[in-house]
From Swiss-Prot:
NCBIfam families: S_layer_MJ. S-layer protein. The S-layer is a paracrystalline mono-layered assembly of proteins which coat the surface of the cell. It holds the Pfam family S_layer_C. Its main location: secreted. Residues 1-28 form the signal peptide. It comes from Methanococcus vannielii (strain ATCC 35089 / DSM 1224 / JCM 13029 / OCM 148 / SB). This is S-layer protein. One of its GO terms (cellular component) is extracellular region. It is found in: Secreted, Cell wall, S-layer. The gene is slmv1. Keywords: Cell wall, Cell wall biogenesis/degradation, S-layer, Secreted, Signal. One of its GO terms (biological process) is cell wall organization. Belongs to the Mj S-layer protein family. The keyword Glycoprotein does not apply.
Length: 567
């Protein structure tokens, strides 16, 4: 997917935690200089001896690589701490801005002689285009979005990517595909809003009229797509099913259930995805809860499974039903725990049964047609030939599939906007009005932080960063709180003023400090370079510098992964 390199501000991982960020890719990187000695000195006796610097113009993947390194360095700061519950709290914060309308009142705008515009941004700009075949807004031109009729293309504004909106690149990691499409899926968040001129209707944008955001005309949504499809055609959208992963308000969630009896969409945070053996080891959720496969029986070509949720050894919820890996599933929701069982089978001798499942906690329930948070109602989103239609029903069929969820603003109109104003979108993103000398710039922005608690080995995706708790180093007597380092931008650091060793993420093209080193002949990294870890000894006010880079963002990410493995 195309990624704009100019908008993301910073991603930092900190708080009271012992965690490292999960990175993927090969662990091998070319080493230049004494990289091992540099890595060994990064943290000594619990003290951090490095600053981490990422380029202001870096791609999002470089920023996440910097956050990954910061998280690993932070984990090394901990020598002892409370180990009573075997988990840790991680804070992930991020900021970003979309493109903007430089001056909504400019008479030169294509929409200047109109009185409404529809603004759209998403986690990736592949989803945002208005031209034929380019994105969700293109599909919606002249159609219905929620219950709003989208205007012609001149009044639909592609604000491209708001990069700290969340996306899930693999929405079906277990390959369940219960509708038999033989497709892979992805999912992404988007935000949209309608800006109107103040009434009367004759007050057009080019008259400098007051602006307003009206009830029912601001939106947050999470939509599912077939892989590498971006919403410009009806066939691009993917039907939600239990077990699918989608982002919701910045965190990757599992669709646990579309409850058609009570019209609920139930989501949960994954804690386990795999197979549980009948009368084998129960899956321990902590706090006295465990999941048990009590029995698996053959029923013709399918199987029936008896799955139980235990609390302190006693059954508190259970289901015994047919499952076949082809649409017949078992779902259990009890308090804040959600379980989806997709398939079951027996060993060759018929001695033991097995059940494939995903287990979730921190269950979130959206009551469709009702306020999820103050002034924001929850809806299912159905993909039809008429557009993306809101629904207060959880019913989803092949003909009229539910392809996402949305929150719609139902508060009072926000009007008489002539000066600086920020409109909150679901307490998550913002629509920002910035007036300067009679010009009114408009854009989406985010400045958000999420606290997540992880058990050892658990990973989460939050605000487009993937975090994994590798280990907890502690004793039960004393807790030593620490704060992990936060990656700086190159504009906030310099070689001449460094008082610690520096880790520079990104090569000379995107990191100005790396460019300084390259201009001095201290490093040699270009677009053809492999994943590289290069030390420039004494190059920063007498301190050493480690450049983590490669010829492209994937090679830079691979170099970061190699460094994390060394720390």
């Amino acid at each position: 997917m195309a990624m704009s390199m100019k908008k993301i501000g910073a991603i930092a991982v900190g708080g009271a935690m012992v965690a490292s960020a999960l990175a993927t890719g090969a662990l091998a990187a070319e080493k230049v200089g004494d990289v091992d000695a540099f890595a060994a000195n990064a943290v000594t006796n619990g003290n951090v001896n490095v600053d981490i610097v990422v380029g202001s113009n870096a791609a999002a993947k470089d920023v996440v690589s910097a956050a990954n390194i910061a998280a690993k360095v932070g984990s090394l700061m901990f020598k002892e701490g409370s180990a009573t519950d075997g988990n840790a709290k991680v804070t992930v914060s991020a900021s970003s801005k979309s493109d903007n309308i430089k001056n909504i009142w400019d008479a030169g705008n294509a929409f200047a002689a109109t009185n409404e515009v529809f603004l759209f941004a998403a986690a990736d700009d592949d989803y945002t285009g208005t031209a034929a075949g380019t994105g969700v807004p293109n599909y919606l031109l002249g159609k219905t979005f929620m219950d709003y009729t989208v205007p012609p293309a001149a009044q639909v504004i592609d604000l491209e990517d708001l990069q700290t909106l969340a996306a899930v690149s693999d929405a079906d990691p277990s390959g369940w595909d219960i509708f038999g499409t033989n497709k892979d899926f992805e999912a992404a968040e988007a935000v949209a809003a309608v800006i109107r001129t103040q009434q009367p209707a004759a007050a057009l944008f080019n008259t400098g009229a007051d602006l307003q955001v009206s009830e029912d005309e601001a939106f947050y949504m999470s939509l599912a797509f077939e892989e590498d499809k971006y919403g410009s055609a009806l066939a691009d959208y993917a039907r939600l099913f239990p077990g699918m992963r989608i982002p919701f308000l910045g965190q990757e969630m599992v669709v646990v259930k579309l409850d058609t009896d009570d019209d609920l969409v139930i989501l949960g945070k994954e804690v386990y995805d795999g197979v549980v053996k009948q009368r084998g080891d129960n899956y321990d959720l902590g706090n006295g809860y465990a999941v048990k496969v009590n029995n698996v029986l053959t029923q013709g070509a399918a199987y029936k499974a008896d799955v139980q949720l235990l609390k302190d050894g006693k059954v508190v919820a259970s289901k015994f039903d047919t499952i076949d890996g082809n649409g017949n599933q078992i779902t259990i929701v009890y308090k804040d725990i959600g379980i989806v069982v997709n398939d079951a089978w027996e060993d060759i001798g018929g001695n033991y049964g097995f059940a494939e499942m995903v287990i979730t906690k921190d269950v979130v329930t959206l009551e469709l047609g009702e306020e999820y948070i103050n002034d924001w109602e929850a809806y299912a989103v159905r993909a039809t030939a008429a557009g993306l239609i809101e629904s207060d029903s959880a019913t989803s069929t092949a003909a009229v599939p539910v392809v996402g969820i949305a929150l719609k603003y139902v508060g009072d109109d926000v009007d008489k906007i002539r000066k600086d104003k920020t409109f909150s979108i679901a307490n998550y993103a913002k629509l920002d009005f910035d007036e300067d000398s009679g010009d009114m710039a408009v854009q989406f922005l985010m400045d958000d932080a999420k606290d997540v608690t992880l058990s050892i080995g658990q990973k989460v995706s939050v605000l487009n960063a993937e975090i994994k708790l590798n280990e907890l180093m502690a004793d039960a007597k004393q807790s030593v709180p620490m704060t992990a380092p936060i990656a700086k931008l190159d504009a906030e650091a310099s070689l001449s003023a460094a008082n610690k060793d520096l880790i520079l993420v990104g090569g000379p093209v995107v990191n100005t400090l790396a460019k300084e080193l390259a201009d001095k002949g201290l490093i040699a990294i270009d677009n053809a370079s492999p994943a590289t870890l290069a030390v420039a000894k004494g190059a920063a006010n007498g301190k050493d510098v480690l450049v983590v880079a490669g010829g492209d963002r994937d090679k830079t990410a691979a170099a970061a992964t190699a460094l994390i493995a060394m720390l």
